[in-house]
Amino acid sequence: MLPLHISLEKKKVVIAGGGSIALRRLKTVISEGADITLVSPDVEPEIKQMAEERRIKWEKRTIEKEDYLNAFFIIAATDNAAVNKEIAQSASPFQLVNCVSDAELGNVYMPKIVKRGHVTVSVSTSGASPKHTKELAENVDKLIDGDFVAEVNRLYQMRRKK
């Protein structure tokens, strides 16, 4: 797979599921300015709070194909592997799909992201070991020096002035 950084600004993102994995995925995409709809009969309290704050739309029911027909990015994160598989297999080949129960059913892995200022590092084990991905990301984070981040941020500002 080719690692890319994709803008989700104003793109329609649909998340199926409301548990802890859905919440982790939601936290990753919410900061990117996406138009997020989460579909699940039950959700973690933090997801409910985000919906109450109107940061996301929450449909309190099971997912239906119509929910993700026009989505740019679909995250199949229910606690039912068969439902996740159905979502992944019925998506258009032009949609980005992350399937949490079987990464190979989707066409997108969600890496662990280490972000400090304008320095962004994506870390992935291609779905093989989330535990090792997390461990590696923590090690990478320790390598990113504050002076380095400041220099990159300064250069970013200089380039914008050109």
Swiss-Prot record:
GO terms for molecular function: ferrochelatase activity; precorrin-2 dehydrogenase activity. Keywords: Cobalamin biosynthesis, NAD, Oxidoreductase, Porphyrin biosynthesis. It comes from the Bacteria. It catalyses: precorrin-2 + NAD(+) = sirohydrochlorin + NADH + 2 H(+). Pathway: Cofactor biosynthesis; adenosylcobalamin biosynthesis; sirohydrochlorin from precorrin-2: step 1/1; Porphyrin-containing compound metabolism; siroheme biosynthesis; sirohydrochlorin from precorrin-2: step 1/1. One of its GO terms (biological process) is cobalamin biosynthetic process. Belongs to the precorrin-2 dehydrogenase / sirohydrochlorin ferrochelatase family. This is Precorrin-2 dehydrogenase. The lineage of its organism: Bacteria, Bacillati, Bacillota, Bacilli, Bacillales.
